[in-house]
Amino acid sequence: MKKNLMLIFGGVSFEHEISCKSAYSVYLALLDLNKYNIYSAYIDKCTGIWYLLDSVSDPPKPIDTDVLPIVSLLPGFGIFSNNKNLEIDVVFPVVHGRTGEDGAIQGVLKVMDIPCVGAGIIGSAISSNKYFCKLLLKSFNIPIVPFIGFRQYDYSLDKEEIKRNVKEVLGYPVIVKPAVLGSSIGINVAYSENQIESCIEEALKYDLTIVIEKFIEAREIECSIIGNEKMKIFSPGEVVVQDFIFYDYDAKYSVIPGNSIIFNIPAHLETNQLLSIKEYAFLVYKNLELRGMARVDFFVEKKSGTIYLNEINTIPGFTDISMFSKMCSHDGLQFKDLIDNLIDYAFQSYINRKKRINFKD
């Protein structure tokens, strides 16, 4: 008997359109597997309301939310639409960015007591916040690029002190980032003290916490991992960016691969570099209690060969140009089997969690 699976996508996020493209790829794989009754839940970009769709398309068809049935979540009862309990057995969230990768949806589904593909609340929340994630990674002795972090309130109190810290602790150039946002949105490079204020102001449009890192000339290496306690680490790949300062939003989604962007899988690395990257990826996945999947991104400094962990993506892209599935495919795991495995990991994680004692009679 087929299980009922809900594919969730869209979201109130700058990465809404990317989520829709990822969902389409996952939807096709689910159709190909023919193991699940698929329910597609679209989250409206403006209102955050969940709607039930008949299917997922690419490019997304115009969605008339006035005629679509709303999806309702009732803890203890289930997920409903059209006054019917859909009896969902597992949820596959493909919501990138806020509410999708920050532990919000994961928390909702935990309250609903429904298995969820991917990391749980803690792993998602920590991985999505660049500032807190970097602080934690330092405690694991995982190398990261020198950085400082601060909140908007701190900046409003004494912006000159923060600018002095940037100059004295990091030196220029630096890269300025919102702490919680994906796809390199809101990120800019400041080459001098004259540019730092405008870069900070731009980043503050997207988040209340800002991370500023020393800018290094580096290769961008990515590593896919799947599994729960027992994990599989795939051959790392490299993103070669030719006409951009770094792998920003435009480079990721507005450029045809093969022109300004080249994907090398596997990445050309020294043996010791390859081993270090896989070891760091393993430590991150284990210590942050990640589940299901992750893409761990690294910098390899061009001059010294020094490795730095950049960031962790707990819901990586599933589009046709996304590195996560490409690296899995290179090592022999085809896309539909990857999707099937991720769903199995969700059930395994759920069953393991249900064995714990929540209360005593």
From Swiss-Prot:
Mg(2+) 1 binds at residues 297, 311. One of its GO terms (cellular component) is cytosol. Pathway: Cell wall biogenesis; peptidoglycan biosynthesis. GO terms for molecular function: ATP binding; D-alanine-D-alanine ligase activity; metal ion binding. Binds 2 magnesium or manganese ions per subunit. It is an enzyme of class 6 (ligase). It comes from the Bacteria. Signal peptide: none annotated. Keywords: ATP-binding, Cell shape, Cell wall biogenesis/degradation, Cytoplasm, Ligase, Magnesium, Manganese, Metal-binding, Nucleotide-binding, Peptidoglycan synthesis. InterPro entries: ATP-grasp, ATP_grasp_subdomain_1, D-Ala_lig_Van_CS, D_ala_D_ala, Dala_Dala_lig_C, Dala_Dala_lig_N, PreATP-grasp_dom_sf. Mg(2+) 2 binds at residues 311, 313. GO terms for biological process: cell wall organization; peptidoglycan biosynthetic process; regulation of cell shape. Its EC number is 6.3.2.4. ATP binds at residues 167-222. It is found in: Cytoplasm. Cell wall formation. Belongs to the D-alanine--D-alanine ligase family. This is D-alanine--D-alanine ligase. It comes from Borreliella afzelii (strain PKo). The lineage of its organism: Bacteria, Pseudomonadati, Spirochaetota, Spirochaetia, Spirochaetales. The gene is ddl.
